[in-house]
Amino acid sequence: MIVSTTPTLEGHKIDAYYGIVVGEAVMGANVFKDLFASIRDIVGGRSGSYEEELTTARKLAFTELEHEARSMGANAVVGIDLDYQVIGDKGSMLMVSISGTAVKTSPL
């Protein structure tokens, strides 16, 4: 599956447009991770636990997006837009949302 932020793919023509596809993942933030991330922010450095959560959520959202596109008969998704949002009480959850257009492509 080809995924791209651009509306076209170099070296490919778009044969069919199948519509908008979306992948979403919501991850809960752990209280202890929050505590250690706050300490790390104070002393400097990167919060590895949050980076892992972001990576996991992003991978899950991409997997969902690609699955939806394949189920429509697409072999690519163009115009990808990736958004992160903090949701829930006191920002207790992270949502990753990816959208794009499912298409059928062939080489030029």
Swiss-Prot record:
Belongs to the UPF0145 family. PANTHER family: UPF0145 PROTEIN YBJQ. It comes from the Bacteria. InterPro entries: UPF0145_dom_sf, UPF0145_YbjQ-like. It holds the Pfam family YbjQ_1. Gene3D superfamilies: Hypothetical protein apc22750. Chain B. This is UPF0145 protein MADE_1007770. NCBIfam families: PRK02877.1.
